[in-house]
């Protein structure tokens, strides 16, 4: 029986996640120049991480949203239901987005618009709305979403710790620099 060094395990996990994410660049080839890949990959990684974090409490958030949608201030209720400082009230997941290629742009925008204001602010600062349009116009949006749906692209906290996720982002930023 061999015991794996936890440091090597962490390093391998970070490299694996960064490589899976980096492979999305293959889908962008042609419509994007290599120096532009980060315009898509970094915000998509943020979106996928948030999505995967929220997946276990998704139904609780949707139920709470139905219960408080008439209230002027509902943010605190929804944060509590999600267990995070952010939430998503959209009925979409990456899996349901993947199931409807015909309406991918509208559905993905509805998914993004379902995030709490703090997440939408982050994505706006990254100029992600323009990239969604550009990917859709280039017929790439669906494929990028499919690429992020793989089992290896699972970025839930049970697969990738917060510290590891920081290293994954650092690795990606270095690749795009």
Residue spans of the language-model regions?
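Non-catalytic, mostly N-terminal accessory regions of nucleic-acid modification and defense proteins
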Residues: 1-177
């Amino acid at each position: 029986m061999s015991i794996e060094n936890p440091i090597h395990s962490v390093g391998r996990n970070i490299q694996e996640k960064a490589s899976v994410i980096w492979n999305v660049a293959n889908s962008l080839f042609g419509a994007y120049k290599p120096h532009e890949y980060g315009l898509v990959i970094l915000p998509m990684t943020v979106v996928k991480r948030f999505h995967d974090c929220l997946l276990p409490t998704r139904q609780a958030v949707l139920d709470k949203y139905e219960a408080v949608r008439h209230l002027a201030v509902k943010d605190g209720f929804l944060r509590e239901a999600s267990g995070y400082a952010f939430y998503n009230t959209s009925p979409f997941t990456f899996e349901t987005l993947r199931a409807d290629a015909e309406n991918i742009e509208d559905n993905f925008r509805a998914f993004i618009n379902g995030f709490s204001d703090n997440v939408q602010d982050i994505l706006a600062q990254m100029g992600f709305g323009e990239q969604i349009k550009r990917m859709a116009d280039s017929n790439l949006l669906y494929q990028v979403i499919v690429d992020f749906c793989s089992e290896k692209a699972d970025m839930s906290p049970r697969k990738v710790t917060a510290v590891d996720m920081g290293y994954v982002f650092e690795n990606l930023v270095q690749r795009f620099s």
